[in-house]
Amino acid sequence: MANYFKAAVKPKTSNQRLTVTVDKLDMNGVGVARWQNKPIFIAGVLPDEIVDVKVIEQKSKYARAKLISIDKQSASRVIPQCQHFGLCGGCDLQMLALEEQLLFKQQKITDLFSRSFSTQNITPEINTAHLPWQAAIKSSPWHYRRKARIGVQFDKNAQATIGFRQKSTNQLAAIKSCPVLVEPLSAIFPLLKKLLAQLTVKSAIGHIEVIQADISDTSSADKIQKDNQVVVVVRQLKPMNDTDIGLWQLYAQRHCWHVIIDDGNKQLPLADIKGGDSFELSYELTDTSKVYFSSNDFIQINHQVNNAMISQALAWLNILATDNVLDLFCGLGNFSLALAKHAKRVVGVEGMQTMVDKATQNSLVNGLDNCQFYQADLNSHWLLEPWVQGQVFDKVLLDPARAGAEQAVSQIAELKIPCVLYVSCDPATLARDSAILVSKGYKLEKISLMDMFSQTKHVETMILFTHTS
């Protein structure tokens, strides 16, 4: 049977100029006004502002417009610190005062909880308008991010653009500096651009990742460590020739970079290819535990918030020396290592065996013999796994990815673990999973924001639940 395809209909545009009053921000931090009895979305504006805009897209149920000028400013408006704000897609809220950013994120969670609890008819009911909010965990709103992926694009004249994606497009915004990256990484863009211009094979680079990490020299017997070093990971689509290897080596020596070449299958320090000192990456927790990781591993990008988050988790859970603690979605052991220093035993579970192996190694390096790590698919049924059978857990911590932990929280409820600490990077799935726990006899005791990604719409949250029995 033949298949027939219709070409995509281009959105209607009118280029009409309007003056509107902004009612609110949507979940993504985009301003919402009313026009022709439908919402019109405008980036870069704030509630109660009167703005002149140009309509750039019309649909039957909504429209989009571009900000032209602001006739009446909000008292919450501040001057963005980044010269690329509005073009670069990395930040959403630089025009909004920091405390107002936190209120916006808190309201976002409140709205999602209200929606989730009402649609699921949760019993017992909780007053989602008055959640038990605690003080937010914050860091400096600038120069906090210790890891980022930088895009690379070459034009037909082999001229490089390096930076981050523009809003709603695959095109890159050419970045000169980034004020949310930690200081050593913030100023790396001009150096990379100069280096890329000198490469003999330019099409071989996919992207570049930059990381601030502690470095241990594995070629020496005493593993000499250097703190807060710059790591540059080069994603190569083709093998790098000797000339380009030499160029990267020159820049590494000149600017104290530690360069890693990623060919898609393995990651090798440039030193292993060219000869020289090899190294390992790590970061330190407040309790001096060392977490070793590879450049392609997930780590929390805000070092200060990460340490404060771990400290708050320990305080809220009130870990006792007699406690058996379950750490789900444990990753490299970011929480497990700290928990193990206070608990009788910690069982960490992660979906990827490679992460399980690294978490196990991290516990050994830190001299912890009361940690065991296991691999399991936590999005399936795991109550019959050997690490659960015959075990009694006093407390559980879970830190899932954005998809949340719908299967996991249902099984936690079956086990009736008395105390549950949920660390979330997605408020929608957090609201869904919280509704499940409350419906199965858990009480929401505490909730706090964690401003891991200041200046952006992204929301991280910590919630403590206790079983009502």
Curated annotation (Swiss-Prot):
Chain sites annotated for binding [4Fe-4S] cluster: 82, 88, 91, 178
Residues given in the record as S-adenosyl-L-methionine binding sites: 300, 329, 334, 350, 377, 399
Enzyme class: transferase
GO molecular function terms attached to this record: 4 iron, 4 sulfur cluster binding; iron ion binding; RNA binding; rRNA (uridine-C5-)-methyltransferase activity
Active site: 425 (nucleophile)
InterPro entries, sorted: 23S_rRNA_MeTrfase_RlmD, MeTrfase_TrmA_AS, NA-bd_OB-fold, SAM-dependent_MTases_sf, TRAM_dom, U5_MeTrfase_fam
CDD domains assigned: AdoMet_MTases
Domain TRAM span(s) in chain numbering: 11-69
PROSITE patterns the record matches: SAM_MT_RNA_M5U, TRAM, TRMA_1
Record-listed E.C. numbers: 2.1.1.190
Role noted for this protein: Catalyzes the formation of 5-methyl-uridine at position 1939 (m5U1939) in 23S rRNA.
Protein name, per record: 23S rRNA (uracil(1939)-C(5))-methyltransferase RlmD
Organism: Colwellia psychrerythraea (strain 34H / ATCC BAA-681)
